[in-house]
Regions:
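Cytosolic regulatory regions of ion transport systems
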Residues: 1-387
Length: 387
């Protein structure tokens, strides 16, 4: 998470300093990014002083250790750092009466990667088949990523021609991913089968957007999840509220028993994550969504491939190694999610706050979608969008 944010903020001309305990990782960051990197423990007052905590405007504690992040945040408070963000995953901290509130700890934003990742998956399941989903306009408008199918109504025609033919269409193509390139479409742009397009539409016009790409939206009623990770637990509770029948497969017997006690309306199965016969016995062929959420990226990719070969409509894999993300489409998995990346948009939106209401970074796409308030100083006021 830290390296991703450091790269983005550095590109925006912020002076960025990263504290990194791993010497190999420190060297990589120095070679790849135009930032200052300090070797050491983020909870150490000496290291934080060396990193210039007295002069910083924003401190983000985003290590894998909640305790280091909390200690670093307390240090930032003592040094009167104006804004502080901490990554805290352990729900026990949130259950202590206001212990993590801004008043008691002084942290401005707390982020939970696993919860944000589960939320991202829930949103994807509410728009089946989409690879990306983001809400704008208080949830009234959606950005969704869809793949253009062979024979889709949009193939071959320019966007200008389609605009004339579909006089009252209520969606907008904002970006296209084609053969690894990102395109911002104009009137003459023609869509091709296999294009990955990002459409902005009102929630009530989702079916039109699907039809445009040659797809039919089928609501998810059953889901199968592999692995009893934190992401899985958060997601199961969300799916229970959505009335989606969910089966969770966990290989560790004691973990499966503990999860069965915690989850009310989720069917817990003790078994190996790659036991295809077990999946079939538990209704894989009738499942609308298969979610590979174990702690092993390779296992998630492999099981996702198997599920896709069983014609499961929606397959999502949890991948924490970001260099695996390009493999997703090649093995037939619909989309990948990452608990590390799930909080990036949340943090960036907060960092840029002010007039920015929402922000979405598109996977495998160099574009970024931003919802902002047009103030009196905005140069685009009273200017036709076509200009």
């Amino acid at each position: 998470v830290g390296s991703q944010l450091a790269a983005q903020l550095s590109r925006e001309n912020h002076d960025v300093t990263v504290v990194e305990a791993d010497k190999v990782r420190m060297t990589q960051l120095q070679d790849e990014l135009d930032i200052m990197v300090i070797e050491g423990n983020g909870a150490s007052p000496r290291v934080l002083a060396e990193a210039g905590i007295d002069q910083c405007d924003l401190m983000m504690a985003l290590t894998n250790s909640d305790e280091i992040n909390l200690v670093a945040s307390i240090s930032a408070c003592k040094h009167n750092v104006p804004f502080k963000i901490a990554r805290v995953s352990n729900m026990d901290y949130y259950l202590l009466d206001d212990w993590l509130s801004t008043k008691s700890l002084g942290v401005d934003l707390l982020v939970n990667p696993e919860f944000e990742c589960a939320l991202q998956i829930r949103n994807l399941l509410s728009v089946p088949g989409a690879t990306d989903v983001a809400e704008f306009g208080g949830g009234r408008a959606l950005l969704l990523g869809l793949e253009v199918q062979e024979g889709a109504p949009c193939v071959g025609e320019s966007l200008m021609e389609m605009g004339i033919r579909l006089e009252h269409h209520d969606f907008l193509v904002g970006s296209i991913s084609r053969s690894g390139r990102t395109l911002i479409p104009t009137g003459p742009t023609r869509l091709e089968a296999g294009d990955h397009i990002y459409i902005i539409c009102l929630r009530e016009h989702l079916d039109e957007a699907y039809k445009f790409c040659g797809l039919v939206r089928q609501p998810i009623t059953r889901a199968m999840i592999l692995g009893g990770s934190k992401v899985s637990v958060y997601l199961c509770k969300m799916l229970e509220r959505m009335k989606i029948r969910t089966t969770l497969v966990e290989h560790d017997e004691s973990s499966a028993e503990a999860l069965a006690a915690e989850l009310d309306n989720t069917l817990l199965i003790h078994g190996e994550a790659t036991d295809v016969e077990l999946w079939e016995m538990e209704g894989l062929d009738e499942t609308g969504a298969f979610l590979a959420l174990t702690r092993d990226d390779e296992e998630n990719l492999l099981s996702g491939l198997i599920a896709k070969n069983h014609n499961v409509p929606v397959v999502i894999a949890l991948l924490e190694k970001l260099n695996y993300v390009p493999l997703v489409n090649k093995v037939g998995v619909n989309t990948a999610v990452s608990s590390r990346l799930a909080i990036v948009d949340t943090i960036l939106k907060w960092v840029r706050r002010g007039n920015i209401l929402s922000l979405a970074t598109l996977k495998g796409n160099e574009a970024e979608i931003i919802e902002f308030i047009a103030t009196n100083k905005c140069k685009l006021l009273n200017t036709p969008l076509k200009d």
